[in-house]
């Protein structure tokens, strides 16, 4: 018989809690997203994360851990070879990525790829380099509007991103070009993890702002995941934020797109008030997209505080047979050099009103304990070829 009727997994995108032993292999030394935010800001107003045990797990600044935490907590290492969104989320649901996705950070995309993209989209490509999304629209937005061209850029992640001004490029046309790019980059030598539409508005430099109409075109997971197993067993698998994009809709029964992380939490609170049996899987991207990549410590800290307020509302509404899991998919230390993700441990914090006391549980060597624990709870077998083991008995 299942222990929990509904499980809520909330991914605080990029909220890492310290460098993994192999982080230097990924170009990351002494990284610690949450720890360094606490160090810089000294205090954060996070009463709900505190009582769940976040500061017992990882403390810093002038903060104090809870005397009697109500959550069960540990840190998870990443077994996969990567530090990106897809690799992290796929691993949570049982897929270990051995071979990292193709990146084009150093020299941009090959001329052959760009030529094919220009031919099929009917637009000249400008940019074609690794850049911050906000900086590249400042640099090239006016040129794109004037000449009807198309800004293409990448990052240290395995992504091809296309910017389009909603007023002159047209949103549907931007999505069409991204669908073309997705097909082109299915070739092995150009195989990127995600193609992302990055729409923006504004007429001139200094006025350009990205909108919430972003859309991700991800590769399908390389195998079946815990999500497929849950859906195939007749359970609800509700996604909030970019989860549906990350899994290419695989294993999802209902999807909600979010305009922001605050909106994502509001959607989750609404879902909590409805009846369902299964999983609600949530990604809150603003920690990463707005603050981590932009190396904005204060913005990141304030985003955590905003999350904490809504976390308190959600916790009140949880039923006795609900389980809440908080985690992250990688790090993105806003105090570190560059603009890219950082290879870090992630938190695992579990809470239910029916739990008999909180405290530390054993550290785990993979994010995949999350998917394995969820399927175990519902008496569902994980698909062949997946990794991970259940820690349901510890919750």
From Swiss-Prot:
Pathway the protein contributes to: Carbohydrate degradation; 2-deoxy-D-ribose 1-phosphate degradation; D-glyceraldehyde 3-phosphate and acetaldehyde from 2-deoxy-alpha-D-ribose 1-phosphate: step 1/2
Enzyme class per UniProt: isomerase
Pfam families in UniProt: Metalloenzyme
Note on how the cofactor is bound: Binds 2 manganese ions.
CDD domains: PPM
Gene Ontology cellular-component annotations: cytosol
Family to which the UniProt record says this protein belongs: Belongs to the phosphopentomutase family.
Protein name according to UniProt: Phosphopentomutase
GO molecular function: magnesium ion binding; manganese ion binding; phosphopentomutase activity
Localization (cell): Cytoplasm
GO BP terms, alphabetized: 2-deoxyribose 1-phosphate catabolic process; 5-phosphoribose 1-diphosphate biosynthetic process; metabolic compound salvage; nucleotide metabolic process
Function: Isomerase that catalyzes the conversion of deoxy-ribose 1-phosphate (dRib-1-P) and ribose 1-phosphate (Rib-1-P) to deoxy-ribose 5-phosphate (dRib-5-P) and ribose 5-phosphate (Rib-5-P), respectively.
Cofactor: Mn(2+)
Principal subcellular localization: cytoplasm
Residues annotated as binding Mn(2+) 1: 13, 329-330
Residues involved in Mn(2+) 2 binding: 288, 293, 341
InterPro entries recorded: Alkaline_phosphatase_core_sf, DeoB, Metalloenzyme, Phosphopentomutase_DeoB_cap_sf
Reaction equations catalysed: 2-deoxy-alpha-D-ribose 1-phosphate = 2-deoxy-D-ribose 5-phosphate; alpha-D-ribose 1-phosphate = D-ribose 5-phosphate
